[in-house]
Amino acid sequence: MMKRAFRGIVLVLVTAGLALAGSARAADPEKKTADAQKLVVDAGATFDEFWKDRDLEWLRKHKADAKGFLIAPEIVKAGFVFGGSGGRAVLVAKGPKGWEGPAFYSMGTASVGFQAGVSVMTVVAVVMTQKGLDSLMSSSLKFGADASVAAGPVGVGTGVSGIKADFVIYSKAKGLYGGANFEGAVVKPSEDFNKAYYSQDCTPIDIIVKGSVPHNKAADSPLFWRIAK
């Protein structure tokens, strides 16, 4: 009798454990999808904030020349991506059919130079050359090695021409622009976020170059409206 009761308890516990594990697995994709959607919303808000800042005159004057924008709403010191500093980013870029995206990326390195006392910053990287855009279509991009980078000019009437770099990067922390060194930073496609957002396996080439991935334009519209208008 005791043995049967014990076996029954074990069976109930095992069944409950399997059910909880199944629920956790089911919840993970849903959470990742929600995280990807939130990242798109946050990226739109980040771009809008940078765009409206009167000191970022260069950004507004050169938007038409840009091949794309890689936006990271939050880069965290000692982040989760590469063990140093890291965060997620989205790319909206010009493809053969016009503006495409978003494509999702991880950005991080052990050596991004944060200012003293800074632990979080936001980043808008302006893709200025075809080489820069092509490098984002690869499996991994290292700033400074695979593509050149320059800090974005800040101030009205300053540095509005003459920058020769594949990426012009604006960073902001504690309300101030600049101060971060992105030489050596690594950018990689985020396969899990791309899959979660589009509900299928896809690459930045599928999303940006081929424009072959159907997606919810309504969800993307705030980000697209800010960049493609």
Regions found by a protein language model. Name each.
Residues 1-12:
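Bacterial N-terminal signal peptides that target proteins for export
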Residues 11-20:
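Hydrophobic alpha-helical targeting segments used for export or membrane insertion
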